[in-house]
A protein has these predicted regions:
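Helix-rich "cap/lid" substructures immediately adjacent to catalytic or cofactor-binding pockets
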Residues: 2-88, 166
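An amphipathic alpha-helix/helix-turn recognition signal
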Residues: 31, 65, 91-92, 104, ...
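A broad detector of short, well-ordered amphipathic alpha-helices
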Residues: 34-35, 68-75, 94, 107, ...
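A short small-residue
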Residues: 49-56, 96-97, 185-191
């Protein structure tokens, strides 16, 4: 017998216009944004649905936006009669998963994200950095390249047997990414404000 699990994504997955159609179609999805805006104190819909990218990509906006969109999708799925046997989240997605699982209220979830996003935005402004997803190499090889690269760059997320995310100083990350490109492996720059999951936070 199969089971349904809802997985909530982390930061870097945001794009202008996300969840707009869900909110137009599902009252339960729209209600998520109502709650978020009450807690946050600003028009999250405008930032999420209309952008611009420069505003949405700010950590203080992208984290609440991703959480709201994730929970909106969860509520839309439930409205369609889909049931879930469990939930899980990656990084930022852990907070949405806690709300979906009933561990914290949606109001408290957005209060937590508001504080988290503000703290991470402050850290990002003090210590700029980058993140790259390295695809097609075992983690051990990614670790080796990072160790051989001058400057601060380290593996921070072990997403699968052949996908590892690296983070660190921008110059070091770019140098490591160039080495992976020479090996004909994908090095995808993540759409985040700093080197999350690293000591720069």
């Amino acid at each position: 017998m199969s089971k349904n699990i809802f997985l909530f994504s982390g930061q870097g997955s945001q794009y202008v216009g996300m969840a707009k159609e869900l909110c137009e179609k599902y009252d339960a999805a729209n209600a998520v944004f109502d709650t978020a805006e009450k807690v946050l104190g600003y028009d999250l819909r405008a930032v999420t649905f209309d952008g611009p990218d420069t505003e949405l990509n700010k950590t203080v906006n992208s984290q609440p936006a991703i959480m709201a969109c994730s929970l909106a999708a969860f509520e839309a799925a439930k409205a369609e009669g889909i049931t879930f046997d469990g939930v899980a989240g990656h990084s930022l997605g852990e907070y949405a998963a806690m709300v979906a699982a009933g561990v914290v209220t949606i109001e408290d979830g957005f209060k937590l994200i508001k504080a988290r996003a503000a703290a991470m935005q402050k850290a990002a402004e003090a210590n700029s950095g980058s993140m790259y997803a390295i695809i097609g190499l075992p983690a051990e090889e990614v670790e080796k390249i990072c160790e051989e690269t001058e400057g601060y760059v380290v593996p921070v997320n072990y997403n699968s047997a052949v996908q590892t995310v690296i983070a660190g100083d921008t110059a070091a990350c770019e140098a490591a990414a160039a080495k992976f490109a020479e090996m004909k492996k994908k090095a995808i720059k993540l759409n985040v404000a700093s080197a999350f999951h690293s000591k720069l936070m």
